[in-house]
Amino acid sequence: MPTGKQLADIGYKTFSTSMMLLTVYGGYLCSVRVYHYFQWRRAQRQAAEEQKTSGIM
């Protein structure tokens, strides 16, 4: 039977691990969103360039 201190240590380690995983997952989600934003911005610029060049000819 674990003592109170051991239970507290297990709880603390579990909580710390879950917070670390949530932080890593949040960073992943943020980086994916930023990547998609830059992809979208590049596509918008290319579309504007194509529209600009097709308007000249």
Swiss-Prot record:
Residue ranges annotated as Cytoplasmic topological domain: 38-57
Transmembrane segments: 15-37
This protein's record includes keyword Mitochondrion: yes
Swiss-Prot/TrEMBL GO biological process terms: mitochondrial cytochrome c oxidase assembly
Membrane topology: Single-pass membrane protein
Principal location listed in the UniProt entry: mitochondrion
One GO CC term on file: mitochondrial outer membrane
Name this protein carries in UniProt: Cytochrome c oxidase assembly protein COX14
Naturally occurring in which organism (per UniProt): Homo sapiens
Lineage: Eukaryota, Metazoa, Chordata, Craniata, Vertebrata
